[in-house]
């Protein structure tokens, strides 16, 4: 069995003392699979999409029984200026308000994720594809800015991102969602 991972720092194991602690290594070892980890810290969905044309990544996908996709957080974290403005708008309009710039990020992400899945399926139609949701790194933080709880407000954005992941995946065959976001 072969598992190939593509995506961002979560899949790449950023910040871990050893790759042996990476959840993908633990998972692969547990099921007796070889892991090809082609994830790159900092990648957003557009960069992951481009990485599919990399010779090694393409070969790893073609030879995999399962492909794990971990991407989404950087689509937002790379656009801190827009997200800071969104937080300001939450102060003015309420926490449920999504500015057009943020909605555009979701739309772009959904298109990229759909294309990533379609390209993987073109390369390896028999592989299982597992797309993981995104966790909210601010959820447990108690930082309040005026009347807005940053963790709670960020959770609305992460929840919407995870809804995007689930909506894209449910339209695809042999694509499964691994939900890592706590309720």
Where do the model's predicted regions map?
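Structural recognition of the beta-strand scaffold that forms the well-ordered cores
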Residues: 2-7, 35-39, 65-70, 128-133, ...
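Solvent-exposed loop/turn segments at secondary-structure junctions
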Residues: 9-12, 40-46, 73-78, 135-139, ...
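Substrate-gating cap/lid alpha-helix
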Residues: 139-180
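Hydrophobic, aromatic-enriched interface-forming segments
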Residues: 107, 112-150
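Serine-esterase "nucleophile elbow" of acetyl-processing enzymes
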Residues: 1-41, 57-59
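Short, solvent-exposed loop/turn and secondary-structure capping segments
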Residues: 14-18, 79-82, 142-143
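Oxyanion-hole/transition-state-stabilizing segment in secreted/luminal serine hydrolases
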Residues: 47-106, 136-137
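Extracytoplasmic/secreted envelope proteins and their assembly/folding machinery
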Residues: 24, 28, 49, 106, ...
């Amino acid at each position: 069995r072969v598992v190939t991972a593509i995506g961002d720092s979560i899949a790449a194991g950023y910040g871990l003392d050893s790759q042996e602690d990476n959840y993908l290594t633990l998972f692969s070892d547990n099921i007796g699979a070889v892991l090809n980890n082609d994830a790159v810290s900092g990648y957003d969905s557009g960069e992951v999409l481009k990485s599919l044309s990399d010779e090694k990544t393409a070969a790893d996908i073609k030879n995999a029984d399962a492909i794990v996709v971990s991407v989404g957080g950087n689509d937002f974290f790379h656009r801190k200026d827009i997200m800071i403005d969104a937080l300001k708008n939450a102060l003015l309009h309420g926490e449920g308000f999504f500015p057009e710039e943020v909605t555009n990020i979701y739309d772009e992400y959904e298109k990229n994720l759909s294309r990533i899945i379609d390209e993987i399926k073109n390369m390896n139609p028999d592989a299982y594809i597992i797309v993981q949701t995104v966790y909210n790194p601010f959820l447990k933080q108690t930082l309040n800015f005026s009347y807005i709880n940053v963790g709670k407000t960020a959770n609305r954005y992460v929840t919407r991102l995870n809804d995007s992941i689930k909506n894209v995946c449910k339209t695809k065959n042999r694509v499964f969602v691994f939900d890592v976001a706590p309720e």
